[in-house]
Amino acid sequence: MAAAGSSSRFAVTCGLLSQYMRERQQPQPPVTVLEAVAEEEEEEDARTMQLFPPRAAAADGVATPSAGTAPLTIFYDGRMVVVDDVPVEKAAELMRLAGSACSPPQPAHAAALPEMPIARKASLQRFLQKRKHRITTTSEPYKKAAVASPAPEKSFAVAPVKDEPATWLGL
């Protein structure tokens, strides 16, 4: 569970690898991994005596990948890095490292998802309150429905009716 501001170990490792590759290849033209390995072997051979001539002959020829190595392709941050002749052990170690890394950071909109049901509930409550208010206010369709329904009759004991003057006739 990585914090929001930190990045996963895999991202850090890939960042360090890309920084190392940039520093190493900056002053030189692009060199393939096969050429770099051949140069290292030549430097090693120059320091030591060549006691085994077949090895010297193999170093001059094209290097063939051994049975325990294979090319490795890494896709990261929109870039592709291809490394030739990676030992199986190193590839397995990289896979374990990538698998043990934390999940990638979630986008910002994913954090807002738990808040959505609460926001919907509040919106629904406001809507229902407004609807209830509209129903109880004096609007014509609802008044007619309320007037049209007959009121239940009261008991037969009726209070005396007072004759009120018809003030409406004086209009």
From Swiss-Prot:
One of its GO terms (biological process) is regulation of defense response. GO terms for cellular component: nucleus. Induction: By jasmonate, wounding, and cold, drought and salt stresses. Down-regulated by abscisic acid (ABA). The keyword Ribosomal protein does not apply. Keywords: Jasmonic acid signaling pathway, Nucleus, Stress response, Transcription, Transcription regulation, Ubl conjugation. Residues 65-100 form the Tify domain. PROSITE patterns: TIFY. Ubiquitinated. Increase in jasmonoyl isoleucine (JA-Ile) levels mediates its degradation via COI1A-mediated proteasome pathway. A motif (Jas) lies at residues 117-142. Its main location: nucleus. It is found in: Nucleus. A motif (Nuclear localization signal) lies at residues 119-126. The keyword Transmembrane does not apply. Repressor of jasmonate (JA) responses. May act on an initial response of JA-regulated gene expression toward drought tolerance as part of a BHLH148-TIFY11D/JAZ12-COI1A complex. The jas domain (117-142) is required for interaction with COI1. Belongs to the TIFY/JAZ family. Interacts with BHLH148 and COI1A. Interacts with COI1A, COI1B and COI2 in a coronatine-dependent manner. Coronatine is an analog of jasmonoyl isoleucine (JA-Ile). This is Protein TIFY 11d. The gene is TIFY11D.
